[in-house]
Amino acid sequence: MLGEIRLKNIFFILIGAAIFSFGLVHFNMQNNLAEGGFTGITLLLYALFHISPSISNLVLNIPIFFIGWRLLGRTMFVYTLVGTVALSLFLSIFQRYEIHMPLQHDLALAALFAGVFIGAGLGIIFKFGGTTGGVDIIARLVNKYFGIPMGRTMFAFDACVIILSLLTYLSYKEAMYTLVAVFVAARLIDFIQEGGYAAKGATIISSKNDLIQKKILEEMERGVTILKGQGSYTKEDIDVLYCVVPKNELVMLKSVINSIDPHAFVAVSDVHDVLGEGFTLDENKNPLPR
């Protein structure tokens, strides 16, 4: 069932929360780097009033639990509860048994590690249907109803919190490196969310479509879809070819097209995740190793 609560998902949400918490304690807090979203607010409260993030994280997220229940349903509520409680638990553990690794002399490295750990942790949590509460839920709702990647929504919200942190306890240098960490995290979240199997999509318009598609099929063993179109100026019906290939085959695809029709119109676009035969399945419909 789509809405079934799975132990596998809960397990990976716990793993993601542990990775996130480790990065936050050992790279953000130790090097006075802020963070965005509700996590950034917990760090702000810690810097100004010495309130433990493990406690303020739970307190701030109580209202969000009700939003999660009403708008995201029972399964999302459970995963959000697990993610939020696990985050606070791991924050408490890592603060209690902290490994001292200060990198104030190299904030660029600290920001990179902070972004990687937080991005990887949140990416895993999101991929398995969970959130850590707060802006994570807002980002998931925006992604669900408007199709905007979660990383972008979070980056915008994060910027607002970081500006507030700059006005209260961050230096300009720390604020700039915090933005670097947030950017790295946002990119990594999108990468993990989209599956990591990126490809290129080519839209081809040519008077020699038959020869082009035949050569693609024979030499590259890639499928080609024929779309129906109409020229804006001539009003003539035309066939438009669409082909998706791995990034490392794009040069070969261009070479095939150019060898038949150097004047062909070719538009190449990014394809963030590809499923199906030739990419995630072999010719016998068995999963390919990724």
Curated annotation (Swiss-Prot):
GO terms for cellular component: plasma membrane. The keyword Cell membrane applies. Gene3D superfamilies: 3.30.70.120. It is found in: Cell membrane. Coiled coil: none annotated. It comes from the Bacteria. It holds the Pfam family YitT_membrane. The chain crosses the membrane at residues 9-29, 47-67, 75-95, 106-126, 146-166, 179-199. It is a multi-pass membrane protein. Keywords: Cell membrane, Membrane, Transmembrane, Transmembrane helix. Belongs to the UPF0750 family. This is UPF0750 membrane protein YpjC.
